[in-house]
Amino acid sequence: MHRTVFAILAALTLFMHACGGESASNESRPDASTTTTAGIDFQSVAGVLLTRLDLQPDERVLLVGLPGRFDPLMPLLREGVEAAGAVDLGVWAVGAGAPGDWSTDFTRALIGQDSGALVGLLSDVDAALMLPGANTGHAVYAAMQQVLREDRGRTIHFHWLGAYNLDGTLRDIDEMVDDFYVRVLADTDYEALAAAQVAFEHAMRGATVRVTTSAGTDISFEIGDRPVTKQDGDASAARAGMGRNLIDREVELPAGAIRVAPIEGSVAGTVVFPPSVWGEERTENLTLRFERGVMVSLEAARGAEAALAEIEAAGDAGKAFREFALGFNPLLAIPTSGERWIPYYGYGAGVVRLSLGDNTELGGAVGGGYVRWNFFVDATVTVDGETWVEGGRLVR
């Protein structure tokens, strides 16, 4: 079970006790089975998902989702699967109330199976779409992740969640958010997004990346030959075949972030967090200092003992620097006028993530299972002294 904490002043802090997809946590959120469908152009959404999936004849495709507000999407996707000459395996429901036509011989064969058997049954699924309401707490979802770890198949993560108020509380997925996400899916320039991410990856290779914030964060690292996962919306089989880790085969839509586990021994410096919750207690001015990728000191104006207890309870993973991520999608940026909110997990252009814990899904060397995500919305990022992000704004 994932547990989520999110706090924002100059940064966002998201904590999870298990690895998974970007939005696969079981955080408190509006029920996907009861929220109105108003504002969602399902035909447009289905078209984008199918285009990004780029199905080939005879590929076997499974949908995984929660019965409810996204029911109208399912027949559109299944029709598209068949139109591409692929094989529709049906829809695995992660909750009660599924329409009868979701079930197929394939999905019925999954009922009651243990995790090992599920992995075997799913091993010849070429593509799965993880739709709203599905997450890593569901057995079929988790088993499909294991298939991906074995360098087989691919998935689209399409959760329609991750909207936050600026104070860090979850924002309802209302008609405004629905319209916003539909536009982002349809209007993202996927080619330009991919080009920007490739350029940044090339800049990082052989260089020193430095992240600073006005609160005092100042940390540097190198990525060596580590895989850089580019969430550019390409969910094709050809792209999955080039994947080097689990998340290369898990494609997020909406798209926008790059993710990398730096060479652990290269990580050095300080991360200063905003007021946030650690070990169920509020902390202020929490400051962690890292040498060779490992936390060597912890200070805080308030809550130091609670933060240290959480970190020590996680073992070595709790003290390890996990990940650097950077958002590139300008359409997911925090709005500069009107209502200001954080779209899709803060993955808009210029948002940085500096995380702690297990980075094996990224191709890193730190295990242990513990993961704490920390999003910063005012960071400056330089690569060998060249500025790419300034004060939370992508400038290249």
Sequence positions of predicted segments:
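Active-site and channel-lining beta-strand-loop segments
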Residues: 283-299
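Intrinsically disordered terminal and processing segments
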Residues: 351-396
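Short aromatic-centered micro-motifs
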Residues: 211, 289, 381
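Active-site bordering "gate/hinge" segments
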Residues: 12, 19-270, 278
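Short solvent-exposed loop/turn micro-motifs enriched in small/polar/acidic residues
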Residues: 202-204, 264, 279-282, 317, ...
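Short, glycine-/Ser/Thr-/acidic-enriched flexible segments
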Residues: 68-69, 134-135, 216, 226, ...
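Bacterial N-terminal signal peptides that target proteins for export
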Residues: 1-8
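Dual-mode signal for accessory low-complexity, basic/Gly-rich regions
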Residues: 268, 281, 297-364
